[in-house]
């Protein structure tokens, strides 16, 4: 009986594995720290629909100059003093859609900003994932 039940559970688990969303289309996942991570398409769609949204690129100035999302503001997360000074001037009533190169810096920025009372969303995989999906950048 146990073998039948385990086999049934395994079959159900395997059959649902292929039901995940296409790359770039999944919407939300929240790691244990509560930061909401959005796939690139969901990220930009939600940012466009959100009248309080601000796109925030937390890469270096050099990286930003090489290409960024249209309309994004830049604050360098790797320069802690400048980053802290920059976020101290931001409006906490706005919603911030944050990205970096691959997702590590943006996640750290989201954690820091969320602790300070900002509403934030992180883009999954950063601009590398964005461009891999053929989505446009501005120079």
Could you describe each region identified by the protein language model?
Residues 2-8, 12, 16-49, 53, ...:
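Rhodanese-like catalytic fold shared by cysteine-dependent sulfurtransferases
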Residues 58-63:
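Short, polar loop motifs at secondary-structure junctions
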Residues 99:
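Short, surface-exposed ligand- or partner-binding patches at beta-edge/loop junctions that are enriched
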């Amino acid at each position: 009986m146990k073998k039948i039940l385990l086999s049934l559970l395994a079959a159900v688990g395997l059959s649902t594995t292929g039901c995940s969303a296409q790359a770039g289309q999944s919407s939300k996942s929240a790691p244990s720290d509560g930061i909401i991570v959005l796939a690139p398409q969901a990220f930009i769609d939600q940012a466009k629909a959100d009248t309080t949204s601000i796109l925030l690129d937390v890469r270096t100035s050099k990286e930003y100059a090489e290409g960024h999302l249209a309309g994004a503001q830049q604050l360098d997360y790797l320069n802690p003093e400048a980053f802290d000074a920059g976020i101290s001037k931001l409006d906490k009533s706005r919603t911030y859609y944050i990205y970096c190169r691959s997702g590590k810096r943006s996640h750290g920025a989201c954690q820091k900003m969320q602790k300070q009372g900002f509403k934030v969303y992180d883009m999954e995989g950063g601009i590398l994932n964005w461009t891999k999906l053929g989505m446009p950048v501005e120079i």
